[in-house]
UniProtKB/Swiss-Prot annotation:
Residues 639-661 have a biased composition (Low complexity). It comes from the Eukaryota. Pfam families: Smg8_Smg9. The keyword Transferase does not apply. Keywords: Nonsense-mediated mRNA decay. InterPro entries: SMG8-like. This is Nonsense-mediated mRNA decay factor SMG8. Involved in nonsense-mediated decay (NMD) of mRNAs containing premature stop codons. Probable component of kinase complex containing nonC and recruited to stalled ribosomes. Transmembrane segments: none annotated.
Length: 962
């Protein structure tokens, strides 16, 4: 023991020189347990008792230190638990995961096992608290301990103790007694007065709070045997260390010891200091206080001397030794309870047995027992203590049920992924009303899985996207002939007279052909109109197919070639791409190759002629050249025609300087001689006058492979589509349109008020006859030609055009400029068609039927009323959408007959090289052409051969683009 007045050792070894001292106590040994919190490095909670471990001591979880002071009947057990900061720090260093909840539950379980052991082997238990107030979490710990003891420990511990030597020493309650619990607060509030009355009042106040909490949660009851622990009656069980500094600064202690050593007692003053002492206010000034002053403070000093934790503990130890330990417990009537004092050997036997059953066997994974209750204790101890886990799990279960119910109650019979995501979001919101905590993430994953399984259980929607981006609403598992999105649009037929309901198309054929064929069967006008026959694929074999990758999609092929040239590896990537996208094709079925030519820019405006006024802003460049944009020159004859057109334009330009002012706004047409070949073509025109080509096509087209998609300027002319996506029809004579009344409802239905007018277009044309012998010229001219000649060669043409837009609700309207809807009235009187003819027109424009600018209408029809004159209007529409410029795909462009009402219906859906071009959700505010536009310069004019009045001209004349 050396300079210490106590002994300390680690359980279970008892030093040989201490064992005889403990044996002398026989059956009067009181076991006092010290447990709780500490902040020092050695996890020491014995500082208030004036005890401390060896300097070489290393704290550890579950370690028990024994303290014994000779001359006392107490054996103090110091329990090192995870409530000690030093032990908790060690566990943190060993922790590998970052799950705080699991770590906290693990630390609490370890502390509960040590506290459970202390309640079974101790008579008195001192709970040490480093804070200044009571920690209410101890109430929760006591509740868990009571649950574990009543539900698990009492089921196996008494039975298993009876099988050992400790069974005869302990009662059926399997412990020495109902232990008395005391509370030691190492720190007193600094703002409280350290007087006897104030300290006692503060201790009593804390006792009342603790007692109320323990009674409220049934930790202590009137029956001592059924209580987890006991509280003394009429005795203090809360102690505040208000005077002693438990862990003083060692440096300050050394300084105080030095001052005490250097202090010397009072001596007689020297005579030379007498004069100085006379200046003192009283005798003994600047000297230590005498014994009289200390005597006056004896009462306070006596209280400080007796107010120690040792004296506080001794009062309860004496109760245990005198046999009145449980008398009057719980502040109720006196009652008898079992209480046993054992010798050190007997206690050691009980301690070993209980420690092994409650703690030791849990740490041994290989331990096997036949006791089912004990087996359940070993297996479920941690789970039974994790009430937070049960609480959070219960909340998550409630939230899960609520979320599943919300999902299933709102789910329709068949729904798609968008609806599923919305329903799942609503289910998650319903879950979050109840479910929360660390297990919420797992519960949400389970909720998503259950909802997904419910959706896939015969409720999944097909969700095949339509060409307008709407999913199919048919069941995915159930067989269905065709897709249907459930969305219905109102659309007009080819001629525009009849409107019908069209389902959302899923194929290009449904969008651009089948619907209009269906409407043509119901429209009285469509069956009567004259249609221009657009070139389509005519198979020569039964197993015809879509064109190969290289022929059908030249743009994709060119991109693949460019990538191959840059990357290493040669042609392997290109060959792989061809195998992936193309079908096998025989050598005999390959399309004929065309020589590469340079394509002209479809967006460029034609050049202006000096013979034509700038106010009309029209070009008189040779239209023959424009007819062959993107195509190779087919014959020397056509080349000569184009050349002659250019020459005539230049000759007319040189002579225009001497012309009069009346010829300033004239369009010059150079007439050519009629040849035998022209006469033959004229004979052909009698057979098919309504669909007359300008120049016969000499290029070979494929009869085994068709073009999958719309024709554009980069697609080969040897491939034709299966069906026409455009429609050009003559709906009647020009007299059916009146500029005073506009388009009537019985003729063109669905037009908005004021937007049902065509715009006038005045064109002045001067015909230039070829030089002939007068007699030959007289023979070649008919009566009508002589009549025109009689009235002069100048013609004033009145053309009416209209660019019609149609929305999905069936509303139709005309545009008077690229950015303005025709409003009628002043717009008709003021505006002409020059703004729409000479400018690019947007493919999409906001419909005025809705206030939202996102509700778009699409350019669907071009209305043309041709004049009654010996000229024909030529159509060459070019729709620029994205990187594609779509055309009619005709090798020869259509010629509109005179004095007739023609309607060109545009495609409903545009598809490029295997790429569907969907309508935009909204237009760009700064550029409404970004989503597509109809290029300017789609109209041309050609002179009609007047030798045959009952025929349309088929001779290759000089053409001029308007």
């Amino acid at each position: 023991m050396s300079y210490k007045n106590y002994y300390t050792w680690k359980y279970p070894d008892i030093p040989e020189h201490v064992a005889p001292l403990l044996l002398e106590l026989q059956n009067s040994l009181v076991i006092v347990g010290i447990i709780g919190r500490s902040k020092c490095a050695q996890a020491n909670k014995m500082s208030a008792f004036g005890m401390q471990p060896d300097k070489t001591h290393e704290p550890a979880d579950g370690q028990i230190l024994c303290y014994y002071k000779p001359g006392t009947n107490m054996l103090l057990l110091h329990f090192e638990t995870t409530h000690d900061e030093a032990v908790l720090g060690q566990q943190l260093l060993k922790q590998t995961s970052v799950d705080f909840d699991s770590f906290y539950e693990q630390m609490r379980s370890r502390f509960l096992r040590m506290l459970l052991l202390a309640l079974h082997v101790c008579h008195i238990l001192v709970y040490v608290e480093t804070a200044q107030t009571f920690d209410t979490t101890l109430v929760t710990i006591c509740q868990l301990l009571k649950y574990v003891r009543e539900k698990h420990v009492l089921d196996f511990l008494p039975q298993m103790l009876r099988e050992t030597a400790a069974g005869s020493l302990l009662s059926d309650r399997a412990r020495l007694c109902t232990p008395r619990v005391l509370f030691l607060f190492e720190n007193y509030p600094q703002d409280e007065e350290k007087s006897r009355e104030r300290i006692s009042a503060y201790e009593f106040q804390t006792e009342d709070k603790i007692y109320e909490l323990l009674r409220q949660y049934n930790i202590v009851t009137n029956n001592a045997n059924n209580s987890l622990f006991a509280l003394p009656n009429n005795k203090q069980f809360v102690f505040y260390n208000a005077h002693e500094k438990l862990r003083p600064d060692q440096l300050l202690l050394a300084i105080e010891a030095l001052n005490a050593t250097m202090y010397k007692s009072d001596s007689k003053e020297e005579e030379e200091d007498t004069e100085i002492l006379e200046l003192a206010p009283f005798e003994g000034f600047v000297k230590p206080y005498g014994a009289g002053y200390e005597a006056r403070e004896s009462d306070e000093q006596l209280y400080r001397k007796k107010h120690t934790v040792w004296h506080f503990l001794q009062r309860h130890v004496q109760d245990a030794l005198q046999g009145c330990f449980d008398e009057g417990s719980f502040k109720q009537l006196p009652q008898s309870a079992q209480f046993q004092l054992l010798g050190v050997n007997d206690w050691h036997i009980c301690m070993d047995t209980i420690h092994r059953l409650l703690i030791g066997n849990i740490q041994e994974v290989s331990y096997v027992t036949n006791n089912q209750n004990y087996k359940a204790y070993l297996r479920d101890f941690n789970e039974s203590l994790n009430y937070e886990k049960k609480f959070w799990g219960h909340l998550c279960d409630l939230g899960l049920k609520k979320g599943i119910s919300a999902y299933k109650s709102s789910a329709p019979a068949i729904y798609g992924s968008v609806t599923h995501r919305q329903l799942l979001a609503d289910a998650i919101l319903a879950f979050e009303e109840e479910g929360r905590g660390p297990y919420a993430e797992l519960a949400l994953a389970k909720l998503s899985e259950i909802c997904l399984r419910h959706w896939h259980d015969g409720r999944q929607q097909c969700e095949q996207l339509s060409l307008r981006g709407n999913p199919c609403t048919q069941p995915k598992d159930a067989p269905h002939d065709k897709h249907s999105s459930g969305i219905v649009h109102i659309s007009s037929c080819n001629c525009g007279r009849t409107q019908g309901r069209r389902e959302d198309p899923f194929t290009l054929r449904q969008a651009n052909y089948d619907y209009y064929e269906h409407m043509a069967a119901m429209c009285n006008l469509c069956v009567k109109v004259k249609k221009f026959q657009l070139p389509v694929f005519t198979p020569s074999i039964s197993d015809y197919r879509a064109a190969a990758f290289e022929a059908a999609f030249p743009l994709l092929l060119q991109a693949a070639k460019n990538r191959t040239e840059i990357a290493t590896g040669g042609d392997s990537d290109l060959e792989a791409a061809g195998e992936l996208y193309s079908q096998p094709i025989n050598a005999t079925e390959q399309a004929p190759q065309k020589p590469q030519i340079t394509l002209s820019n479809g967006c460029s405006q034609p050049a202006l002629s000096a013979t034509y006024g700038s106010d009309l802003n029209m070009s008189i460049a040779g239209f023959g050249a424009s007819l062959n944009e993107g195509e190779e020159v087919r014959s020397p004859e056509i080349s000569s025609q184009i050349a002659s057109s250019g020459l005539s334009s230049r000759s007319n330009s040189t002579s225009s300087g001497t012309s009069s002012a009346n010829t300033a706004n004239e369009l010059v047409l150079q007439l050519k001689e009629r040849t035998d070949q022209n006469a033959a073509n004229a004979a052909v025109s009698e057979i098919c006058p309504e669909a007359l080509p300008i120049v016969a096509s000499t290029e070979q087209v494929s009869t085994t492979e068709y073009l999958p998609g719309l024709v554009h300027m980069s697609s080969g002319c040897e491939l034709l589509p299966l069906f026409p996506s455009w429609s050009l029809a003559c709906v009647g004579p020009s007299s059916i349109y009146s500029h005073n009344t506009g388009l009537q409802e019985h003729f063109q239905s669905g037009f908005l008020s004021g937007a049902n007018f065509l715009l006038p277009w005045d064109v002045h044309v001067r015909l230039v006859q070829p030089h002939k012998h007068p007699q030959q010229q007289q023979q070649s001219m008919g009566k009508k030609s002589q009549r025109y000649r009689k009235h002069g060669d100048r013609l004033a043409l009145k053309i009416f055009v209209g660019f019609e837009y149609e929305c999905s609700r069936g509303h139709r309207f005309m545009m008077c400029s690229p950015d303005r809807v025709l409003r009628g009235g002043a717009d008709i009187e003021r505006d002409t068609s020059s703004k729409v003819v000479n400018n690019n027109m947007p493919l999409y424009f906001p419909c005025p039927c809705r206030a939202q600018p996102t509700y778009l209408a699409q350019l669907m029809r071009i209305h043309v009323v041709t004049p009654k004159a010996p000229v024909n209007i030529i159509l060459d529409p070019k729709m620029c959408v994205g990187k594609y410029t779509f055309t009619l795909g005709c090798p020869t462009l259509p010629r509109l007959s005179q004095s007739a009402y023609w309607i060109l219906r545009l495609p409903y859906v545009y598809q490029g090289d295997n790429v569907l071009i969907t309508p935009p959700e909204r237009l760009e505010p700064d550029d409404n052409m970004a989503s597509g536009c109809l290029l300017a310069g789609m109209f041309g004019i050609a002179e009609t051969d007047t030798n045959e009045t009952n025929q349309q001209a088929i001779t290759p004349l000089t053409f001029t683009r308007l």
